Amino acid sequence: MAGMKEIRGKIKSVQNTRKITKAMEMVAASKMRRAQERMRAARPYADKVRDIAAHMSSATPEYRHPFMVSNEGAKSTGFILVTTDKGLCGGMNTNVLRATLQKFKELEGQGKTVEATAIGGKGLGFLNRLRAKVVSNVVQLGDTPHLEKLIGAVKVQLDMYSEGKVSAVYLAYTRFVNTMKQEPVIEQLLPLSTEQFEAKDDKDSPTPNTSWDYIYEPDAQTVVDELLVRYVEALVYQAVAENMASEQSARMVAMKAASDNAKTVINELQLSYNKSRQAAITKELSEIVGGAAAV
């Protein structure tokens, strides 16, 4: 009977765990839908700013913004690492941190030191364990990222590049592909490539065959400067939004897998309990029959 009591205790424990994982799965599914909506809503803004900046840059070809000038001579490299603040999201953080570590080794092989910005608690902890130089960080963004919370940390990297202190700035995050798939990516944020700002005049452009004619206040250079900063900030925000959509998707999938595994364990324990109970009943019946035969 002690064995049966122990099995009953295990069944109850796993059932309680399954209730928790099932609830977390439902919460993650709800948050995932909202995160995907924010991610999709952020894309048109960055695209529009890029298109306007492209046309304005072509209107002032003699001016080259610092973000579009290479700093090859600098011995340091900027790096923005986007991760989650919480765990229980499968191997999502592990994958992007593994890719980041590989990139760090590659940069080290080129004689570059890394000056990093961490967005998310998991990434900050990782960088601290590596004893990497963390120049800025932002954690506890919550379920809804706000650009004003990111600007301060990101501005540190932008200023370092504008001042020629870093040769490039990289951005690492988890790209949302679909609910079942998320992939770690590392993109070069700065310097901006000229291809990004080639003026488009085709059906894919939001304003095809349109003549752009602006009156600049105070002047075109100032407006371009401001637009390019906004564009880079929008790229970082888009990465954070994609990372959050990936987080909720990965968490939902992980909690569903945990719930399914818990159900399998419960079924196996229930089978063991039934076998133990059957054996105990058979033993009692055998003892009764044996006693009756002795009488």
UniProtKB/Swiss-Prot annotation:
Main location: membrane
Recorded GO CC terms: plasma membrane; proton-transporting ATP synthase complex
One term of GO molecular function: proton-transporting ATP synthase activity, rotational mechanism
A GO biological process held by the record: proton motive force-driven plasma membrane ATP synthesis
Keyword check for Amino-acid biosynthesis: no
Stored Gene3D superfamilies: 3.40.1380.10, ATP synthase, gamma subunit, helix hairpin domain (1.10.287.80)
Source taxon at top rank: Bacteria
Membrane topology: Peripheral membrane protein
Compartments (UniProt record): Cell inner membrane
Keywords: ATP synthesis, Cell inner membrane, Cell membrane, CF(1), Hydrogen ion transport, Ion transport, Membrane, Transport
Coiled coil: none
Assigned protein family: Belongs to the ATPase gamma chain family.
Assembly description: F-type ATPases have 2 components, CF(1) - the catalytic core - and CF(0) - the membrane proton channel. CF(1) has five subunits: alpha(3), beta(3), gamma(1), delta(1), epsilon(1). CF(0) has three main subunits: a, b and c.
Role summary: Produces ATP from ADP in the presence of a proton gradient across the membrane. The gamma chain is believed to be important in regulating ATPase activity and the flow of protons through the CF(0) complex.
Name recorded for this polypeptide: ATP synthase gamma chain
